[in-house]
Amino acid sequence: MVNRFNRLTSKEWLPFQKSWFKYESDTKLYSDNLRFFCKAEPSEEKVLYFGRNFDLVSSIGKELKIDVTTEDQYDGPLQFALIDLRETIQGIKDLSEYIVLRDQVISLLGKVYRHMIHRRFVCILMPNLQLENQYLPLAWDMAMQISSMYSLKDEKIGCLNLQDENQVESTRKDVFYSLYFRKDENSTGIYSPHVHNLLNSAQDKKIESQRELTNHVPAWFILKPAPRKKNEILHPAKYPEELVLMFIEKFTDKDANILDPMSGTGSTQVASLKSGRNAYGTELSSYFAEIATKRCSELIDPQAPELFANKVANNFVILNKDARLISSADFPEIDYMITSPPYWDMLNMKGAENQAKRIEKGLQTNYSESDDDLGNISDYNYFLNDLIEVYFNLLNCMKPGSFLTIVVKNIKKKGRNYPFAWDLASGLMQKVHILPEVFWCQDDINLAPYGYGNTFVSNTFHQYCLTFQKPN
């Protein structure tokens, strides 16, 4: 296949498609983006740069035979726009300063829209921001606002290498976003404000607990879980016990009550019991509820004691029940909730590569065929609103000041990007406080050459671990 999009070989194309990367230097960051998003042959079409490192970007452009210009100097067609807000964001002292910056970016992108070549990209580099005890997901807001003008196509997470992994302060300067937008048949260039709760609730809600609870959860981590056992492989979307263990040990003490309302094969409950916590949950599928119960029972009362290092003394209850119907009468008061919901109806996408592999092995490809299954709702907004209501109801079962962690990712479906993680956070922030996000970065999956030679489509190898606090 001929590459008409950029100047990379097929071997060079693949690494850029990974949705997270270890940041090495600004030089490499800029160079990688210019090489990927600029045309294969030298062109009179320029690159617009907005930021504090014009001299560096311009010098890289000269080496690549790309003409880099600024907002004051550009004229004629543009093949790429690179907007670097990282340093500017880190210097912001309050929300009003960000609004001024956001308006400046919106104005700039409105002006350059007619100069952008059709189906070419805009990249915005920026972090979210911690201000004292308020967390502001500014990158999510910026993406939502710009998506009314340009099509939101993708994101990559820049992960900064840490000198001492034991001295991590979640997110502040440890990760940043590379947000990618495209001028195409679905964009208009006309700004329309996107209404959400990401910044409104941040203005008057503050985290009420001691910050050290989150200071030791890394902003990003690579997890290589143990191979799934036979009965665990049966579930199409299991998350690893190692991940659960990392969070419950940071957010709870021994004998705490842990809840997962969408238990699957019992990863949360098994990790909780092994770490000396009480484990509770519900599971809509009787099939998976039975597997989860059996796994927990083996820990409490092992049939082959010689295979288990220690017999578990804590309690567990797993109900075969719709999470929508959970009440405070079902379980003791909950100290912490960790869960991973369905990623909309993505498991019903029959053409997905992972689905094809499971079908070939005779494994189940979705959670269930039940009409009550959230994963079978086809309308995105209905699905999102139902899920938010599930979590709002579960707050009634949780102690004041307790935490909940939700493992999710943004979704690409039929050429469109649905910011599921951001939309879910926005909905929940009507009633809970958000903490800095944590990224589970996957490094053990083969890359696929999506869009090769035509456009940019990343391989989504990062998941959001979103943590919230119930107000006191």
What label would you give each PLM region?
Residues 1-472:
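Class I S-adenosyl-L-methionine-dependent methyltransferase catalytic core
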